[in-house]
Every structure is written in structure tokens, then in C-alpha cells.
């Protein structure tokens, strides 16, 4: 995945990694209404901030609704997925770097 380039992540979901640091990185993600980010986990801590829209997250079996201006912390190794309830845009911040997304 290229830095500062949009990439199709899943149907109705595109993402762009902004210039990463040494230990932290930020990724912008845009969802069409009804689009989903499949459930997964990773050893990285994640902070997600909703720039626009409304999304329903499942985090370790609990539903968390996120609207514009709200954020959520996703702990290391937590199983999580998301569904956009309307067109949405968010920022994900990861530490340490998500090497799996950078390579």
C-alpha cells in the first residue's frame, strides 16, 4: 500500500495511510453506507475518530456506536469490525506501526 494514496480495502471501503512516524501511524478510511470492515484483530493499539457519519463497531462482542466528533479505543488483540450506518469517514491511529499495511 502506498503512502498518501487511496486503496480499495473492501467493497465500499477505501483507505489512505498518511505519512507514518517511527512508532505511530494514521490512516483515513471512507465508507459507503452499508459497507463493512470485516472482523479482525491485530497486536496494535488503535484509536478511531469519526470525522463524518455514523458507524456501528463490534469490539470483543460489544456494540459501540460512533458518530461525528466521537472516538473509540480498540485495545491490542481485540476482535473488531464495523458497519457504516450512513456514508462515513474516520481516522485510525495505530501504535506500533502496522507493518502489514505498509508493505
For each feature predicted by the language model, list its residue ranges.
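A cytosolic small-molecule/anion-sensing beta-strand core signal
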Residues: 51-52, 67-68, 86
